[in-house]
Every structure is written in C-alpha cells, then in structure tokens.
Amino acid sequence: MGPTACGKSQLAICLRKYLSIELISVDSALIYRGMDIGTDKPSFSDLYNHPHRLLNIKDPVENYSAAEFQKDVLREIDEIIKLGKIPCLVGGSMFYYNVLLHGLSILPPSNIKLREYLIQKSYEKNYLYKKLKLIDPISASRIHKNDFQRLIRALEIFYLSGKSLTELKKKNNYKLPYNIFQFAIIPPNKEWLNNKIELRIKKMLMLGFQKEVEILFLRGDLHKNLPSIRCIGYRQMWEYLEYKNSYKDMFNKTIHATRKLAKHQLTWLKNWKNINKIEYHSTSTILAKKVLDVLEKNDFSV
C-alpha cells in the first residue's frame, strides 16, 4: 500500500527475487484495457516477467463494483495458495483493501432510474457530498467529494434501503480467513511527494497520454460519467478534448487531482490498523530488505 508515485509496483516486483509470490493488482484504474500511460501501468516487459492478476480485466465501457473485486480477489488468493505460493497484493485503491479486509454488507442492487437521477445531480457542485454528509457523515468522511461513483452508491443504498451504509456495515460478520502482513510505503514529506507527482504527470504526457485518451474519445461509446473516464488524468484530458479547458488547465488540474488523491490515501493509512509503515527509498532492494526484516521478526517462512 501507499500513496501514488511511491514505488509500490517496483517494490512488489523486487520482492519476487526473495519470495515465492504471485502479484495481484489492487487498483481501480489498472483494471481497464487500453488505459496504460495515464494509470502508470507496469511496462509490457515487467508484466511479461511479473504477471499481475486483476489487471486489464475490463473494457473502459464496463463498470466494476467493489463486490466484484471482493469475489475476484478472494478467488485469486485461493488459486495462488493452492499453487503453493504467496499472494502479494499491490496497489493504491484503499477502498478495495478495506473491502477485502472487512467485507461488504448485503446491499440493495443498483436502481437505474435512481442512479440516473443522482448522476444528473452530480453536475451540481458538491451536491452529492453535502447530501451524504447529512445522511451518513461517517461514510462522507471516508469518501472524496469528487469520487462520484462511491458517493452515488452510498446515497443509492440509503434511498433504497432506508439505512445508511455505515448502519449496514455494522451488521457485517465477514472475516478474512488468512494470516496477513500489511505494508505501506510512506513518503519522506509532502514537498517530495508533490514533486514526484508533477514529474510523473510530465512523463505521462511525454509518453503520449493525449494520444491514448484521443483513441478512447474517438470510440464513440465512452463518456465522461463512466468510472473509467472519471479516473484522474483521463477526466481532465477528456475535458480538454471537448474544448472545455486549455492544455495548461488540463495539466494543472491533473496535478491538483493527483495530489488530492495522494492526500486521501495517506489519510486512510494514518488510521489503518496493523500496518508496517516503511519510509520511502529510491532503491527497491532496500525497501524489500525492510519488508523481509519484518517478516523474519514475525517468524514468517516461505
């Protein structure tokens, strides 16, 4: 775990030198095919040598729910264990990790008409977030005000069931049937992380991110309300292609949104239980050594 641009993927790949592990991606953006540059997906070479499960499993026009992730990731974990190997989950989607660790309550299925209404209301600035804050302040504190997919789902659950997401979660008796070790890479300071994020976005644009989004834009079956196109970077570039902002605005808004995401990820990690926090280092082998030291102290054997 860890905020964006902290080297999670490189560390996971490095750990394969020392441990018999199989990698599982825990990232709500990396699931989409054809969205490689803007999601900072591992290179073709890295994926060939170090396959990641739950990566490139959906077309951008498709939705992917937290319930689907829970089912898929538990299946992948079970398959890896049956192979006699260790599942290693890597990514920055903190909500997905939370679902894996604590489960989901039995929730009402989505209602098309209600969802369409809430999507329309999402165009009103902060409407969804303010509404959820009144209904379910605990859930609102855990969901970013621009995370429309989760805000809509939380409101949808309340309107359909009459109970808040927080209330329903209290009735959840789910327990993960595995012994787990949790690690998070922590950046040295805010300024360092902000600089890393800006450098990543500049590199992304140099690698042809605009062309990648243009290909999606010209398909004709995608729109900006889809979860895939709401991914950071894609949403801003999409608006640029619609002539709704300048190239400079697109660049600055992408940096701003990515920094907010990193802040949100660190907020999750601040209160995360039973986690081993590892200070960032530019050399993956040094980070791997820190992970191995923790495992050794806990009598972990391969």
Curated annotation (Swiss-Prot):
Q: Which family does it belong to?
A: Belongs to the IPP transferase family.
Alphabetized InterPro entries for the sequence:
Dimethylallyltransferase (IPR039657), IPT (IPR018022), P-loop_NTPase (IPR027417)
- Looking at the UniProt record, the site noted as Interaction with substrate tRNA sits at S93, R115
Q: Its quaternary structure? A: Monomer.
Could you tell me which NCBIfam families the record lists for this protein?
miaA (TIGR00174)
* Co-factor requirement: Mg(2+)
**Full protein name:** tRNA dimethylallyltransferase
What GO terms describe the biological role, i.e. biological process, of this protein?
Answer: tRNA modification
Does Magnesium show up as a keyword for this record? yes
Which organism encodes this protein?
A: Buchnera aphidicola subsp. Acyrthosiphon pisum (strain Tuc7)
Tell me if Magnesium is a UniProt keyword of this record. yes
Instruction: Look up the EC number in the record and give it.
Output: 2.5.1.75
Encoding gene, per UniProt annotation: miaA
From what superkingdom does this record's organism come?
Answer: Bacteria
Keyword annotations from UniProtKB, A to Z: ATP-binding, Magnesium, Nucleotide-binding, Transferase, tRNA processing
Function comment: Catalyzes the transfer of a dimethylallyl group onto the adenine at position 37 in tRNAs that read codons beginning with uridine, leading to the formation of N6-(dimethylallyl)adenosine (i(6)A).
Task: Map out region (Interaction with substrate tRNA) in residue numbers.
Answer: 27-30, 149-153
Question: Which residues are listed for substrate binding in this entry?
Answer: T4, A5, C6, G7, K8, S9
Q: Which residues bind ATP?
A: G2, P3, T4, A5, C6, G7, K8, S9
